[in-house]
């Protein structure tokens, strides 16, 4: 594993006292740029799996990510502080930035989905959250076009795939023989 490989170097960033899954994927460069998205920095993540990656120059966003990094570095897992600056404007684009679980990310996703007027498009590796599915189902009933792509190997009795499909939402399984690892939800208001 990657952990086993790193442990042999005995660097201080290898924690032996952790439990659970740390699934963050971000990098802060010089306190003014960030990279973030669904991509794991592995050969498969970069060359075989479908992923997305955002590269953004913003010292305010970098401050948010630096605070999250420091929480993790200090061992504050699952109970950190709320994000410093949840609303950040970069040029003409307004970003909302949250970290889970402390910022209640699912609530923010549901709020945005509820605002959709014409369409919701989503791609997700794993989709088990009933509340987010409920928000999509309600928008579908309001004649908002809802379409999604989900990782085929993650479709199970725990996933929301069958629920959405049975309700008439256009949801498909991906066809990448590796992983469709995208995580994105897009809604349109006109």
In which residue ranges do the predicted regions lie?
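HKD-type phospholipase D/PLD-like phosphodiesterase module
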Residues: 1-115, 135, 141-190
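Glycine-rich anion-binding loop/nest that anchors nucleotide
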Residues: 123-125
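Active-site environment of divalent metal-dependent phosphoester hydrolases
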Residues: 128-130, 155-156
């Amino acid at each position: 594993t990657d952990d086993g490989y790193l442990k042999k170097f005995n660097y201080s960033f290898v924690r032996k006292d952790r439990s659970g899954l740390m699934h963050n994927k971000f990098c802060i460069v010089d306190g003014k740029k960030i990279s973030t998205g669904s991509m794991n920095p592995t050969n498969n993540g970069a060359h075989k799996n479908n992923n997305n990656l955002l590269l953004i120059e913003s010292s305010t966003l970098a401050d948010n990510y630096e605070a999250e990094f420091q929480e993790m570095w200090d061992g504050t897992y699952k109970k950190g502080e709320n994000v410093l600056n949840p609303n950040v404007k970069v040029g003409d684009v307004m970003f909302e930035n949250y970290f889970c679980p402390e910022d209640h990310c699912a609530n923010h996703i549901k709020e945005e989905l509820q605002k959709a007027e014409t369409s919701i498009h989503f791609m997700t590796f794993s989709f088990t959250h009933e509340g987010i599915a409920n928000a999509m189902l309600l928008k579908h009933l309001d004649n908002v076009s809802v379409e999604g792509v989900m990782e085929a190997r993650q479709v199970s009795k725990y996933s929301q795939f069958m629920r959405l499909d049975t309700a008439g939402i256009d949801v498909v399984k991906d066809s990448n023989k590796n992983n469709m690892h995208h995580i994105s939800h897009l809604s349109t208001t006109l």
